[in-house]
């Protein structure tokens, strides 16, 4: 296939040799399209037209190898992936026998977000299946605005925070059929197929119910479930001046529903810096304080809070949390070493500058 900018993409098409719905399978970033091969063959045998593309920079598609690029350049390449996915989608729906009104998208790891964004661009995508990956804000907003879209998510407890991320992502969707499949030690993304033999037939059964047999008419919004605590929290937080009210919701949830994760660390951190970018350091401080409370073992949360205090001109607090960052780094076992080095450099730089200029001792 050719992407819009002329890059040649490689994909595998699995035909059921009869009319049927279509599926787009999107691989994770430490694999290529072949990771979906067994599932694709099984789905084709059940009557589905399936396409599994390689993103540019992976497998047999053209483009610089993503793992050989600096992070900034890799991000530029990844921004082209939606166009690559659209090329695969367009090729699939052009095939004879494909039911263009019944399409599913499935993604693993970094393919998760691409699957949701494909559904956002093409309402013919009637369900998404997500394995062990995050969804960016545009995708989450689409899930919130599309209670008619059923979501199947799966992740394993041994895969870092993937399970909690999947649980949190489902909190943005109000479809009553949503399902989260939890495994104990199945690995990451499509690796789960080899460890949990029931996952593949479970996903195909999901397609039978939510794609092949489901009515084409979208369910009315009145059939949606009530907003989840996740949706209520983020709706509140992102309103102008909403951080203080969101903190009350967070504190109440901590008291009454300790198993509910209202925010992953990275998402709260990103939103806090978004507030700093707008010049709203007071709101950012509240967000970073919640993040410290929720993830006290992470050195990065303290470093971010230090940044917010510094932006607010509160130099004593900025110094205190920069020093706390270095203390927590010693016992932080979850942050990758490369990132820990960046956090250490950030904290040490602030400490040097703050001590050199003297802290603000005003009451």
Question: Where are the model-predicted features located?
Answer:
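Conserved alpha/beta-hydrolase
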Residues: 43-66
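Alpha/beta-hydrolase active-site loop
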Residues: 35, 71-96
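Primarily recognizes the serine-hydrolase "nucleophile elbow" in alpha/beta-hydrolase
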Residues: 87-148
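C-terminal catalytic histidine-bearing segment of alpha/beta-hydrolase fold enzymes
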Residues: 177-236, 258, 346, 355
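N-terminal cap/lid segment of alpha/beta-hydrolase-fold proteins
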Residues: 1-16
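Short beta-strand/loop motif that positions the catalytic acidic residue
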Residues: 147, 152-155
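The serine-hydrolase catalytic nucleophile loop
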Residues: 29-41, 55
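Short beta-strand element of the alpha/beta-hydrolase
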Residues: 20-28
């Amino acid at each position: 296939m050719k992407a819009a900018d002329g890059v040649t993409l490689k994909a595998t098409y699995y035909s059921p040799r009869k009319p049927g719905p279509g599926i787009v399978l999107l691989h994770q970033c430490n694999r290529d399209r072949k990771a979906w091969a067994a599932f694709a063959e099984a789905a084709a045998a059940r009557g589905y037209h399936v396409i599994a593309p390689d993103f540019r920079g992976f497998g047999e598609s053209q483009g610089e190898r993503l793992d050989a690029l600096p992070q900034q350049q890799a991000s530029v390449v990844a921004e082209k992936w939606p166009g690559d996915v659209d090329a695969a989608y367009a090729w699939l729906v052009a095939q004879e026998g494909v039911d263009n009104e019944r399409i599913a998208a499935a993604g693993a790891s970094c393919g998760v977000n691409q699957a949701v964004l494909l559904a956002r661009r093409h309402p013919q995508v009637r369900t998404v299946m997500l394995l062990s990956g995050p969804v960016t804000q545009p995708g989450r907003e689409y899930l919130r605005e599309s209670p008619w879209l059923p979501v199947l998510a799966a992740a394993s407890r041994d895969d870092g925070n993937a399970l909690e991320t999947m649980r949190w992502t489902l909190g943005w969707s109000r479809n009553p059929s949503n399902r989260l499949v939890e495994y104990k030690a199945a690995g990451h993304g499509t690796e789960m197929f080899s460890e949990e033999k029931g996952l593949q037939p479970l996903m195909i059964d999901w397609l039978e119910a939510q794609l092949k047999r489901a009515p084409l008419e979208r369910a009315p919004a009145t059939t949606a479930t009530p907003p989840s605590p996740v949706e209520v929290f983020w709706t509140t937080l992102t309103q102008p001046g909403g951080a203080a009210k969101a903190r009350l919701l967070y504190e109440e949830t901590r008291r009454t529903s300790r198993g509910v994760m209202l925010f992953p660390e990275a998402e709260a951190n990103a939103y806090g810096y978004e507030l700093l970018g707008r010049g709203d350091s007071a709101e950012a401080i509240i967000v970073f304080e919640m993040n410290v409370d929720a993830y006290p073992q992470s050195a990065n949360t303290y470093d971010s809070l230090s940044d917010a205090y510094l932006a607010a001109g509160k130099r004593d607090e900025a110094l205190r949390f920069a020093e706390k960052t270095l203390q927590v780094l010693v016992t932080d076992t979850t942050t990758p070493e490369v990132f820990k080095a960046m956090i250490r450099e950030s904290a040490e730089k602030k400490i040097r500058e703050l001590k050199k200029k003297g802290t603000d001792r005003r009451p």
